[in-house]
Amino acid sequence: MPKHGKKYRNATEGLDLTVKYSVEDAVAKSLAAAPAKFDETVDVAICLGVDPKYSDQMVRGAVTMPNGLGKTVRVAVFCKGEKEAEAKAAGADVAGAEELVAKIKEGWLDFDKAIATPDVMALVGQIGRVLGPRGLMPNAKTGTVTFDITTAIKEMKAGRVEFKVDKAGVLHAPLGKVSFGSEKILGNLKALIDTVNRLKPSSAKGTYMQAMAISTTMGPGVKVDPTLIKKFIEG
């Protein structure tokens, strides 16, 4: 088992990682335990009561964080004609069709999010093996295949997060930076939970949100008592 560094040990001193806390306390303790000198990212992991091997239990979606994510998001837009000018006017870092696909085939990947208009998806499919594994492939289910590129770009820039459960039924998402403080992190977490709850599959049985943990880039995972999540949402 790997040994943790001195900063990590000092930060977690007095923190019982076996205890499950309220959502508010878990966030506060996670922020207080962030050991690094840089502004760490705060993340959440949520274990859902779904079986992703069944397509009707795959939970996938997107949410625009009300308090942003505290980082610059570089957006690439696959589009043609007038849409290219619209994309650049809306704040896209790069926009185009054939020439953009060719550039990516050559190894260029200097962007964080990708959007495409429906009419160029056949072209984008040529680089699916490049974009897919990196989570960059535009997808209609998450609103990144659309003719309304202005709205999509603005949402991306504002802190839009796409998520889906992994094979174990766990969903991971960033909530912002440690410097945000508890209030802004909790606001983003509430928006995420609201969205995930709306996406609950009708075929999912039993407890939907089975476990949750809050962590920072270099910090420990602080567990949340799942029975208190509803109280947090309604509070």
Swiss-Prot record:
UniProt keyword list = Repressor, Ribonucleoprotein, Ribosomal protein, RNA-binding, rRNA-binding, Translation regulation, tRNA-binding
Output the superkingdom of the source species.
Answer: Bacteria
Q: Name one GO molecular function term.
A: rRNA binding
- Report disulfide bridges, numbered on this chain: none
Which PROSITE patterns does UniProt cross-reference here?
RIBOSOMAL_L1
Q: Cross-referenced InterPro entries, in alphabetical order?
A: Ribosom_uL1_bac-type (IPR005878), Ribosomal_uL1 (IPR002143), Ribosomal_uL1-like (IPR023674), Ribosomal_uL1/biogenesis (IPR028364), Ribosomal_uL1_3-a/b-sand (IPR016095), Ribosomal_uL1_CS (IPR023673)
Annotated CDD domains? Ribosomal_L1
Q: Which Gene3D superfamilies match?
A: 3.30.190.20, 3.40.50.790
Assembly information from the UniProt record: Part of the 50S ribosomal subunit.
| Record family assignment | Belongs to the universal ribosomal protein uL1 family.
Identify the PANTHER family for this entry: 54S RIBOSOMAL PROTEIN L1, MITOCHONDRIAL, LARGE RIBOSOMAL SUBUNIT PROTEIN UL1M
Q: What does this protein's UniProt record list under function? A: Binds directly to 23S rRNA. The L1 stalk is quite mobile in the ribosome, and is involved in E site tRNA release. Protein L1 is also a translational repressor protein, it controls the translation of the L11 operon by binding to its mRNA.
List the protein's name.
Answer: Large ribosomal subunit protein uL1
